[in-house]
Regions:
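Acidic/His-rich structured neighborhood in mature extracellular/periplasmic domains
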Residues: 97-255, 326, 330-333
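C-terminal soluble interaction/assembly domains
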Residues: 277-333
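N-terminal secretory signal peptides that target proteins for export/translocation
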Residues: 1-10
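C-terminal motif of bacterial Sec signal peptides marking the signal peptidase cleavage site
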Residues: 25-27
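Small-residue-rich helix-loop
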Residues: 248-269
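N-terminal mature-domain "stem" immediately C-terminal to a signal peptide or N-terminal signal-anchor/transmembrane
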Residues: 29-99
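Extracytoplasmic/secreted envelope proteins and their assembly/folding machinery
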Residues: 43-46, 131-134, 231-235, 266, ...
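Sec-dependent signal peptide recognition
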Residues: 13-18
Length: 333
């Protein structure tokens, strides 16, 4: 956005306050469509590596793992080293750990593997949502390579990973926010997004994060907010049927809290003069995930800085209808 180019502390303060004031007056709810509906559809390839990996038999682990390497030569090394953390050349240790991964009940691996296969037996809805999202993204950025999606079971090690033209999803991390074995591996606030319905949002969010770099000379909170806000705004255009709270990873109650107290949130940010701070502790509090946003109040959800940034960008776009998505994403904050 032209207003947010680096033009000095005093000027950016005045402009920043002005834009935030516009946000407070105008609210949110951009329904303007920036991507036409009648575009050529594409289909993203989804590889069911999970079915193959769980087809390994405890009494023939060595042979079955070799077959996985033969059948999935591009992904198997990524899975073994990147997800399981086992050197590919250490086949004896890999076989030992893999047998435990298949049969262990104390850590819940065996139960979780079965639950994952049952819950993700049908992925038609996921396929449809991802097809729509990547179709719309491909219309905007036709030169971007559409990734191949691999589903796998990670032993609670990974939710979404990205490597070159591969996106991987650990489906065992999306078994529902009340899945009992999550109590052993994550904090309560993280469970909100550990649902099957969150997979498509997480995949597209990861893809955007890797393909749209953050560039800022000063790395102030306001610039971080705007950058995250632009990503969320673009995501809302890729998945227009998704509720706003799902896009940011909030519950409906958390979203409603933010809307109810948005003026108080803004007043708190202004009182603390946080907009132009660069301290990592301040940026982390507002931007990174957590049980709450400590710089505001313990009653708040985490990542309030992302929510505020989205509101700012949404307000900007509703008041500047001639600005295209390309122009928005290419602006320096």
């Amino acid at each position: 956005m032209e207003q947010f180019k680096q033009i000095g502390n005093k000027a950016i303060r005045q402009i920043g306050y002005g834009l935030l004031a516009i946000w407070m007056l105008c609210g949110c709810g951009n329904k303007y469509q920036y991507i036409p509906k009648d575009i050529e559809p594409i289909s993203i390839d989804i590889v069911r590596f999970d079915n193959a990996q769980l087809g390994v038999r405890p009494d023939s682990v060595k042979q079955d793992i070799k077959k996985l390497y033969d059948d999935y030569e591009s992904f198997m090394p990524i899975f073994v080293e990147g997800i399981l953390g086992i050197p590919t050349e250490d086949t004896a240790y890999l076989c030992e750990m893999y047998a435990q991964f298949l049969t262990d009940t104390a850590m819940g691996f065996a139960q979780t593997n079965a639950k994952a296969q049952s819950l993700f037996a049908n992925i038609d809805s996921l396929q449809e949502t991802l097809n729509m999202g990547f179709t719309r993204l491909h219309h905007l950025y036709p030169d971007w390579k559409i990734p191949t999606l691999y589903l796998f079971v990670s032993g609670f090690n990974s939710s979404v990973m990205y490597y070159e033209d591969i996106v991987g999803v650990g489906i065992d991390m999306y078994l529902g926010s009340k899945y009992p074995y999550y109590n052993q591996v994550v904090y309560d606030y993280q469970k909100q997004t550990m649902r099957k319905a969150c997979v498509a949002v997480d995949v597209l969010s990861m893809y955007l994060a890797y393909n749209i770099p953050y560039n800022s000379k000063y790395n102030r909170l306001l610039e971080q907010m705007i950058f995250r806000g632009k990503q969320l705004f673009l995501l809302s255009q890729l998945l227009p049927d998704e509720p706003e709270w799902e896009l940011i990873g909030y519950s409906k109650e958390q979203w409603d809290w933010c809307e109810k107290y948005e003026k108080a949130i803004w007043n708190r940010i202004m009182e603390k003069r946080d907009l132009f701070k660069t301290e990592s502790s301040v940026l982390s509090s507002y931007i990174n995930d957590g049980p709450f946003t400590s710089e505001v109040t313990q009653d708040s959800p985490g990542r309030l800085g992302q929510w505020v940034g989205w509101r700012i960008v949404d307000s900007y776009m509703r008041n500047n209808k001639k600005v295209t998505l390309h122009e928005l994403m290419n602006e320096n904050d």
